[in-house]
Amino acid sequence: MEVSISHYKSIEKVQMKLGRVTVLLGSPAAGKSNVLEAIALATYFDRYAFYVDREPLSRLVRATDVSDLFTFYDLTKTVEISVGTGEWRRSLRIYFQQGLRLELNDAEVPFARYFKLPNRSLYLFSYGAREYGIDPDRFSKLLEVLGEKVVARLYGFDRFKDDIINSMVNGVKVEAPQGLLREDGKNFGIVAKKQPKVIRDVNTELAELSRVEVKLLDDGRVVVFDNDIAMKPSAISDSVFRILYILVGLSSATFYTKLHGLEGRTIVSLEEPEGQLFPQFFNHLVEYIAKFSEVGYVVIITHNPILVSLLRDKLNVTLYYVYRGDGGFTEVAELDKDKLAEELITSEDILFMKPREVLRLCRSAS
């Protein structure tokens, strides 16, 4: 899968060729999350073909003001994001020319300006005291132009933590889509019922560590028992919520891809899935990533060398190093596996090395 991003947040221009499983390594604040956001942004409008109550775009890309998307707020530039394979392409352009313009696959994205958008599910951005939202009466024509649909997910527990935990402990908040976990987790209860293996796998691991057990109730609530006593949500480790969220996300993406015949057209981005996660869950995480990679593409940000080693032991992983160049822009370079092997360089070594030291181990820098 080829990805090209220009003038998006910290990214002036990068080009990448991603494998079925791609891991982004690099120092903090290098701009790795901006790569995941760009992929989510370019594929966001396909969601209008599948369900109504969509996740807010502004939360996915962490921007309510459209000018936040432009590198250094330079509105003379054009945000350009292209994601695709030989079978499909999503090419998004955002620019200002006598006002805001959005183009997707060379077709104009129909939107309207409002002082206050009446239907919040159509909201895109704000700018200049106005709100921009999709024009529902004209959007069906754009979907026809796109042809075969693409589905992408950006699962980041820390990004949506409050909504995720609230949905798990209090029950389903939003029912759509029924087969695929939302990034904000608001349909967790409905989706998790069709992924019973996740609950079993998590409980099997917990049984080895303690007498803690997870139960999914009929109303979609998650209840965690410690020595047969229901725990208060505030006493439950985030690690339990995180692994449930990530595994249900991956498993549901596999299910949804097969259900809708979307093989090769589904992307799951994982933002630091290992954060605050019990290391004992890593094998399950790798297992679910491997299974989804048979039908779609996985892009992972991680700072954990153990997870990277497990992935590389079991899967053909494409490794990219993400760093800040001399101009302060995000740049990327693919790590050369042969060079890493020759010099006995591990993932842990890379995380502690300076960019100039890592770049000599790369194929080429963008």
Per-range role (PLM):
Residues 2-4, 44-265, 328-341, 347-366:
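Phosphate-coordinating catalytic segments in nucleotide- and nucleic-acid-processing enzymes
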Residues 73, 280-366:
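C-terminal lobe/lid and adjacent interdomain/linker elements of RecA-like ASCE P-loop ATPase modules
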Residues 267-269:
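Walker B motif beta-strand of ABC-family P-loop ATPases
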Residues 275-279:
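Conserved D-loop-proximal element of ABC-family nucleotide-binding domains
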